[in-house]
Amino acid sequence: MAGIVNVGVQMDHVSGITIAGDSTFAMSLEAQARGYRLFHYTPDKLSLRDGRVYATAQQMQLRDVRGDHFTLGEDERIDLSTMDVILLRQDPPFDMAYITSTHLLERLHPKTLVVNDPAWVRNSPEKIFVTEFPDLMPKTLITRDPDEIARFRQEMGDIILKPLYGNGGAGVFHSARDDRNFSSLLEMFAQMFREPYIAQEYLPAVRKGDKRILLVDGEPVGAINRVPAEHDSRSNMHVGGRAEATDLTAREREICTRIGPALKERGFLFVGIDVIGDYLTEINVTSPTGIREVKKFGGADVASLLWDAIEKKRA
């Protein structure tokens, strides 16, 4: 393959991001520094006609300046097969709109390298993919059956109940064995979600943090520890979690070694896994975050390592 000139960035609109913690911004900034031309578009601007995939896009220039971080050019209708690389970076929810975009991008890959591979993104939902490694996980139940969930809670004691396709800590509940609101919680989930939900044993180690580990082409390259707020079980930064520097433990390296081959096999060049204590809880392949935080705490320049891996794939 030839080198990289044009990079499409499929993302939520650049005007709405917070650059201090946005991994898509970090990835795009590194691409710009390498001399690539960036083309910005949102998923709703994708089209398929006569077997070709188009997007209404704008050339994008970035600056690492809060409040003045981007300039967009005029709208252009672009045949996405003219892109060398496309970054698939819109945030979940992992709904039919998201799934449809992966079908369209699959028409382009691998001649145009889509990061991550859209077919495998579609076939590897983050809270289901992880169940391929049951010995690395906490006890987990995926179901919509309230009786099954009640039995699971009786067995486990405290549990976490969360949407199967949510993100950012939204809709995550900690329910104790004696929770009087448990029936109401199940009723609320039944009304809100048509698909199954996920129940997981509560891990007290979350009070010490939920570690986000970043992997490039199956190899761990950096990590941060996300500590939840005092009265919250969620460590996501969106809901008040606090990031801190960390190193990988022997157990965490073992987890990375176990899952690395599966990530490489599926073309996942950039992945973020979540580990609580000794347990793997999620494998994030859609739009993982953490690049800027790792660098902020003196860790690797993950965006640079990622583009090194992309260039190697394109060579």
From Swiss-Prot:
PANTHER family the UniProt entry points to: GLUTATHIONE SYNTHETASE, RIBOSOMAL PROTEIN S6 MODIFICATION PROTEIN
Pathway: Sulfur metabolism; glutathione biosynthesis; glutathione from L-cysteine and L-glutamate: step 2/2
Keywords: ATP-binding, Glutathione biosynthesis, Ligase, Magnesium, Manganese, Metal-binding, Nucleotide-binding
The protein's name: Glutathione synthetase
GO MF annotations, alphabetized: ATP binding; glutathione synthase activity; metal ion binding
Domain ATP-grasp stretches: 127-311
HAMAP family listed in its UniProt record: GSH_S (MF_00162)
Organism: Rhizobium meliloti (strain 1021) (Ensifer meliloti)
Residues annotated for ATP binding in this entry: 153-209
EC number: 6.3.2.3
InterPro entries the UniProt entry points to: ATP-grasp (IPR011761), ATP_grasp_subdomain_1 (IPR013815), Glut_synth_pro (IPR006284), GSHS_ATP-bd (IPR004218), GSHS_N (IPR004215), PreATP-grasp_dom_sf (IPR016185)
Cofactor: Mg(2+); Mn(2+)
Cofactor annotation comment: Binds 1 Mg(2+) or Mn(2+) ion per subunit.
Taxonomic classification: Bacteria, Pseudomonadati, Pseudomonadota, Alphaproteobacteria, Hyphomicrobiales
One cellular component (GO) term of this entry: cytoplasm
Pfam family, one: GSH-S_N
Substrates-to-products reaction catalysed: gamma-L-glutamyl-L-cysteine + glycine + ATP = glutathione + ADP + phosphate + H(+)
Nucleotide-binding as UniProt keyword: yes
Residues that, per the record, bind Mg(2+): E282, N284
Family according to the record: Belongs to the prokaryotic GSH synthase family.
